[in-house]
Amino acid sequence: MSTIIGRKAELKELDRLYRSDKPEFVAVYGRRRVGKTFLIKQAFKDRITFQHTGVSPVDQEGERNRMKTQLESFYYSLLNQGLEGVRMPKTWMEAFFLLEQLLMQLDNGSRQVIFLDELPWLDTPRSGFLPAFESFWNGWCSGRDNIMLIVCGSATSWILGNLTHSKGGLYDGSPTR
């Protein structure tokens, strides 16, 4: 079993946010292969309620096909983690609605950790991902004290531009970095 070395401050901060009595939005970003995903998985082990990793855009042809691939993969994550009796979403707004349904179904009152890895890969051109994600956080997550939304990505400029320094829908609701 692997262990984390030299990340005590990060683990302490993640634990503090986990124990918070309000909704928390955390963004973890940085170069590829430095252990972002490993850090989150080790910090939360069996406490992750929903987890999804975006599909690499490499070898995906056409904007429409990339969006379809991302939505299909997200749908399979929903099914694998307990959602039943639903069709594949056609839009990101619908996909996040299905995630809300799953989270309500799984809610037992304890902290729900949602981990979206490689988040920038989900935002394909003209997919409507960012407004749907903003609606998910602003309209649903931020009203629930037991939600901890963690996003991860190696596309630092995307994370900074669209989440942490956003002047759009996440303005003043930007994540802890």
Explain the meaning of each model-derived region:
Residues 1-177:
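Phosphate-binding site recognition
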